[in-house]
Amino acid sequence: FILLIPAGIGYVSTRVNYDVLSYLPESLETIKGQDILVDEFGMGAFSMVVVEDMPMKDAAKLEEQLESIDHVKDVLWYDDAVDISVPTEMIPEDLRKAFFNGKATMMIALFDDTTSADDTMDAITQIRKVVGKNVYASGMSGVVTDIKNLALQEMPIYVVIAGLLSLVV
């Protein structure tokens, strides 16, 4: 029973590193590329934000909201290339396809830190709180955030099961 005290302290104070890239050697081109992105361009991660059934003016307001979130360096969208008053039918098809598909439009949120950094995952969480329904944040940073949240949600269950099984033995 006494061993549960240090086990509990260890459980509470142990931090899980979700940054898979931190385990790779510095000599890999992926690591070098990410370091260059962060050091020279001030960004290392991105997320695609898909917006469905939203008028252009509201999407422009949403873009501004996303840009105001901590650690979101920039948000790229249609209005960065063309004013929203220009009908989408007037722009070249390749540009239109890059931003629109049916009633959905895509924005690209650029973060000032790496894919699995705590600041990036916090920004993804904030984006998901701000956007509401019919807006979806995806990409590797979104996946890592989801994995982290699932692990944190399920870990107490596994710890309790392990504790009960150890009492049986």
Regions found by a protein language model. Give the residues of each.
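Feature of extramembrane
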Residues: 1-167
